[in-house]
Amino acid sequence: MDFKSRKYKIKKHPKDCKLHAKKYRGTLNSKGKNDNDCLIMCMRCRKVKGIDSYSKTQWSKTFTFVRGRTVSVSDPKVICRTCQPKQHDSIWCTACQQTKGINEFSKAQRHVLDPRCQICVHSQRNDGDDNLESDKFVDPFIGDDSDLDDDIYIHDKQTINSEYADDVSDNTDEERTESKGQQESNSAEEYDDDDSDEDRMEEIFQQFKKEKQIV
């Protein structure tokens, strides 16, 4: 059988995949080799490790299927179990300033920048323990009543300033209207003065003509 003929030529695979990029523990001619014997390098510790050192999610990133064949990715970006970040089992509560277990926080509070435990959340809603009601709770992001008074004072001051600015703008508009009307009246008076000057010149010219005829 002529394997060099065009009939038996293997089609080219995509450029981002390599058919022989796998590194097996045994030789290439060893029997029973499969994908589980493949070694992959971790992108963080830069160590070549087997399938036992990777999770299923990370291991699925190393291979793909092309025309029914399992093909390894040329440069897979995978992280071994040792280098993967661990899940936090405790969270710092910003309300009571204590480190508590993750089970004491609701799922919504676990993903915010200022997490609060369930006890502190209930205490703010006036549904918590009586011991917590004895100590006045101050939200570090909102402040106490004095901060609220300051905010009200600042808001009132800004309102007064805005009203004063509106009054000043109204006065300036009236002044502009008056000045514009005065300019128009002045221009009309100047136009009347020009007409009177022309009439006077006409009278002088007519008088000059009469005197010349008499002579």
Curated annotation (Swiss-Prot):
It is found in: Nucleus, Nucleolus. Pfam families: Stc1. Residues 159-202 are annotated as: Disordered. One of its GO terms (cellular component) is nucleolus. The keyword Acetylation does not apply. InterPro entries: Stc1, Stc1_sf. GO terms for molecular function: protein-macromolecule adaptor activity. Its main location: nucleus. GO terms for biological process: meiotic cell cycle; regulatory ncRNA-mediated heterochromatin formation; silent mating-type cassette heterochromatin formation; siRNA-mediated pericentric heterochromatin formation; subtelomeric heterochromatin formation. The keyword Translocase does not apply. Residues 164-176, 187-201 have a biased composition (Acidic residues). Keywords: Cell cycle, Meiosis, Nucleus. Required for meiotic chromosome segregation. This is Meiotic chromosome segregation protein P8B7.28c. It comes from Schizosaccharomyces pombe (strain 972 / ATCC 24843) (Fission yeast).
